Design a protein with these regions (language model features):
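Conserved beta-alpha junction segments in alpha/beta enzyme cores
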Residues: 1-88, 95-146
């Protein structure tokens, strides 16, 4: 088995609108600054010809349409099985909205969206390039405390 990983900063440049917490009036305005950057992390497991790609980002969620676009793009470009691409979000209510087409606050940014898709592909490429032999083990143990 080989495993590769990648990490990318995904904080947008310029005006950054935040997602989540609908009842805050300032959600309709851009953020006043960046307290902490947001990141994406990826890991690729390879066993023979089989690959499983996990991509996680510090965002609220992935819309189904975006997830479908990502899976199609990775399958067409790199030959990975669509069912072996998993996207997850940290569900961060203070993250960016630029990638989200249908959120009610903030502003969707087509350029950022395309850049984000590109970043996912770059993470896949980096994972493949730095994949190294690894051993995966699974254990289970009941722990009791008083």
């Amino acid at each position: 088995m080989n495993i590769g990983h990648a990490r990318r900063k995904i904080t947008p440049q310029g005006d950054i609108y935040l997602i989540g917490y609908r009842n805050l009036p300032n959600r309709l305005e851009p953020a006043t600054g960046v307290h902490d950057d947001v990141f994406a992390n990826a890991i690729l497991f390879q066993q023979g010809e089989r690959e499983v790609f996990l991509f996680n980002a510090d965002v609220l969620e992935f819309e189904e349409s975006m997830a479908e676009e990502v899976k199609t793009m990775l399958a067409e470009r790199y030959g990975i099985d669509r069912d072996c691409v998993l996207l997850s979000a940290t569900h961060d209510h203070t993250s960016i909205v630029a990638y989200h087409r249908s959120w009610w606050t903030g502003k969707f940014d087509e350029n950022y969206y395309r850049w984000f898709l590109d970043t996912i592909c770059q993470c896949f490429e980096v994972c493949r390039a730095n994949a190294q032999p690894a051993i995966c083990r699974l254990g289970k143990q009941a722990v009791y405390y008083t």
